């Protein structure tokens, strides 16, 4: 087992190999058994640490799968722009994987998105467009309508939904 040091002492590395891309970190997150919860019981509690994905959530898996599938089936061309409405972790996953795979990303988001999520999205290179998240489906200012409009204006743009 490889051991790595950190500020709290020594801990086992969950993946000590050298990877060729940050996308190789997506998935295969560690599983930890919570012994203290089951002391004296005839059961096991295992938790999957999805926060260990590069974007901080299980949505990185979804983004990677969506992009790889779309690239494989030809609906997402090399270098094409990804346009999606999201105010959460799916947008962060798409921005991260999009950047790593050479796709510009435009995220249409709510005005209520947290500063932390906004910072992550921009750090991953996403262009942000604010939408009225409470606008009904018939309102041209709702997030989906804005995403559809932007995607229609950009040659070869791709939407996951």
Q: What is the predicted function of each stretch?
A:
Residues 1-161:
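PLP-dependent amino-acid enzyme catalytic core
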């Amino acid at each position: 087992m490889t051991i790595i040091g950190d500020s709290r002492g020594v801990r086992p590395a969950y993946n000590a190999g050298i990877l060729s891309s940050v996308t190789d970190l997506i998935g295969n997150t560690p599983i930890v058994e919570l012994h203290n919860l089951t002391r004296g019981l005839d059961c096991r509690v295992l938790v999957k640490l999805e926060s260990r994905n590069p974007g901080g959530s299980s949505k990185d898996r979804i983004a990677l799968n969506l992009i790889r599938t779309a690239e494989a089936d030809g609906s997402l061309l090399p270098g094409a722009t990804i346009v999606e409405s999201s105010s959460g972790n799916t947008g962060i996953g798409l921005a991260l994987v999009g950047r790593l795979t050479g796709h510009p990303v435009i995220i249409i988001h709510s005005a209520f998105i947290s500063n932390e999520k906004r910072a992550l999205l921009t750090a991953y290179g996403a262009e942000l467009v604010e939408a009225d998240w409470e606008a009904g489906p018939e309102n041209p200012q709702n997030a989906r309508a804005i995403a559809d409009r932007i995607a229609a204006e950009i040659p070869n743009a791709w939407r996951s939904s």
